[in-house]
Amino acid sequence: MRALALLLLLPATVLAQDPLGTLLGAGVRLRPEYDGSSREELQPIPIVRYYGRVLFARTTQGILEGGARSEVLRGLNLGVQLAFEEGNDRTGLDPGASLGLHAEWDTKVGPAPLSVLFRTRHHLDSDRGNQADLRATVGVYGGHGAFVAVFGQATWASDEWVRSYYSTGEGGLLFSALGVEGAYDLSSRWVLVWSVHGRWLHGDAASSPITERKTNYFLSTGVAYRF
């Protein structure tokens, strides 16, 4: 928290407006084979960022998701989303999808843009249970074609989700994460995006028989076209 407070003291070069627009592209991500694995893999990832008057699609809030939302108060949006959910080959869990609700508040802390998201995710396969995310992102620099933000997230999971992913255990706080993400204008139309974060497992996920590391790191980069 002290580091975050220092970042918020950056001068007025911090962005007050959305600099990114609509993005579509592709990249790669270095991640553990599953959350808690000691082995890493490189996987292709989409880069999506679209906000219409009602519909949206994005990969900028931790998962690939799309849906509809509406601004009910200034800066406060409520909506519904369909999201892609990762599988786990170690426990024979196939990738799937979830349906959920979210509330997102966009405001400022001084000159810095702040976004706070609460999101529920109910897996379409009822045996996989539910998850809930609380995520906050704050912009810390914007200038010279670059944008940098820090983010933190906490995710909770039901008993069913923990057992389907880790083979045993009970629900509760699943993981917490802290990271940095950014974008850089390669040209007026092309944007380089990147992200790095650490993820810490908690509860029965951390003590699962298949958990080899309680802390994992994720790195991603890619190029997107700005419409």
Where do the language-model regions lie?
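Cleavable N-terminal export/targeting peptides
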Residues: 1-21
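Short glycine/proline- and aromatic-enriched beta-strand/turn motifs that initiate or cap beta-hairpins
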Residues: 16-64
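Residues that define the transmembrane beta-barrel architecture of outer-membrane proteins
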Residues: 20, 40-46, 74, 93-99, ...
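Residue-level detector of the transmembrane beta-barrel scaffold of outer-membrane proteins
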Residues: 21-25, 56-58, 75-81, 113-117, ...
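Membrane-embedded beta-strands of outer-membrane beta-barrel proteins
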Residues: 24, 46-48, 66, 101-103, ...
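Surface-exposed strand-loop-strand hairpins of Gram-negative outer-membrane beta-barrel proteins
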Residues: 32-44, 88-95, 171, 204-209
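Outer-membrane beta-barrel transmembrane domain signature
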Residues: 54, 63, 105-109, 121-214, ...
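Mid-chain, structured segments of secreted extracytoplasmic proteins
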Residues: 60-92, 216
